[in-house]
């Protein structure tokens, strides 16, 4: 059975967001590696990291806004506008807007006349060798599947007054304020504390000290990349909160995953749709259940006649995999199974 168009669009969106998040993380890691191990100085790196996050969040916002406009049109027959005075829009125009945003994410290039922070991100991505390090295959495959797949019968949809509310936190100063605790932890200040500790422990053993210092620096580079990735994803998830509010009434939310999620995310995906009617519940479901380096995104529906294919698969596998196991033991068995599925998909045994 062919997948509904809305499901194909969701898979494209998740793949595009993952690319933007991972690409921003790659840039942040490259910037961190310019820090002096022995004299970590926060100033230049902090400015670069903040601007990278701002650019990544702007890119994610562009993709997610165009996705939400199309998703709402397909699901509800109406959507929010970009400017006042227009009462309807063709679904083909919404598709084109989304494709344009996705193709920019695929190229990791936002053109010469775009927001300066997007230009910065594009330039830093090229300088870091991002095109050779970050595969675009998943996104292009999802985009091709959608373009060759089924189409909704809707042609035009009604535009409702109002625009999608954002999170209002995408200037360098606001990003730095919002993330200052985490930036300190993973940035130069946190690393300087680690260096001081290693010096106390291994200061008399130069070889051991150098080894531990290099390992600590590599660990921090991964933390920096994870921070940038998570900050980018958080921007889009907050836009989803605005969309859930915009839809009003009882909104059903399910976990949308990439092809091979971790056991935790696969478990949440297996639970299917949960109806949410209060903003606090939406905030919890959309904004607080994501681990570091997670690229899941909420699937939102007004009607829940059929689960998306991935969710349905995990829902069917849960009782089979966990048969005879309960509670924490069931979750342990499930995680082991999910890890084995991921290993197989990556060419393992």
Language-model-derived ranges and their functions:
Residues 59, 63-67, 72, 152, ...:
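N-terminal nicking endonuclease/strand-transfer module with a His-rich metal-binding environment
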Residues 1-113, 117-121, 130, 134, ...:
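Non-catalytic accessory regions used for complex assembly or targeting
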Residues 108, 150-152, 245-249:
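Residues at alpha-helix termini
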Residues 1-15, 33, 40, 96, ...:
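Intrinsically disordered, low-complexity regulatory regions
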Residues 182-268:
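A broadly conserved sequence feature marking short terminus-proximal activation segments
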């Amino acid at each position: 059975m062919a997948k509904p168009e809305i499901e194909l669009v969701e898979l494209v969106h998740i793949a595009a967001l993952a690319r933007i998040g991972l690409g921003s993380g790659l840039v942040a890691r490259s910037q961190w590696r310019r820090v002096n191990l022995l004299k970590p100085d926060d100033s230049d790196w902090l400015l670069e990291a903040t601007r990278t996050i701002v650019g990544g969040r702007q890119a994610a916002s562009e993709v997610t806004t165009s996705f939400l406009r199309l998703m709402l049109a397909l699901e509800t027959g109406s959507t929010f506008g970009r400017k006042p005075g227009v009462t309807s829009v063709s679904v083909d125009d919404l598709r084109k807007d989304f494709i344009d945003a996705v193709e920019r994410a695929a190229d990791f290039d936002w053109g010469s006349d775009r927001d300066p922070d997007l230009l910065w991100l594009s330039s830093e991505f090229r300088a870091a060798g991002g095109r050779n390090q970050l595969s675009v295959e998943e996104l292009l495959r999802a985009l091709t599947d959608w373009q060759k797949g089924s189409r909704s019968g809707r042609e035009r949809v009604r535009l409702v007054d109002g625009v999608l509310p954002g999170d209002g936190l995408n200037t360098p100063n606001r990003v730095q304020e919002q993330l200052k605790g985490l930036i300190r932890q993973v940035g130069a200040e946190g690393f300087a504390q680690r260096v001081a500790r290693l010096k106390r422990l291994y200061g008399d053993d130069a070889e051991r000290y150098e080894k531990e210092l290099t390992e600590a620096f590599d660990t921090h580079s991964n933390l920096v990349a994870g921070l940038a990735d998570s900050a980018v994803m958080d921007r889009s998830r907050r836009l989803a909160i605005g969309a859930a509010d915009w839809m009003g009434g009882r909104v059903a939310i399910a976990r949308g995953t990439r092809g091979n999620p971790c056991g935790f995310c696969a478990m949440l995906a297996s639970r299917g749709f949960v109806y949410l009617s209060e903003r606090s519940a939406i905030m919890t479901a959309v904004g607080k259940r994501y681990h570091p380096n997670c690229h899941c995104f909420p699937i939102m529906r007004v009607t829940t006649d059929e689960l998306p294919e991935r969710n349905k698969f995990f829902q069917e596998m849960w009782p089979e995999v966990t048969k005879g196991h309960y509670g924490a033991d069931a979750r342990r068995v499930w995680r082991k199974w999910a890890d084995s599925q991921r290993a197989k998909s990556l060419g393992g045994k």
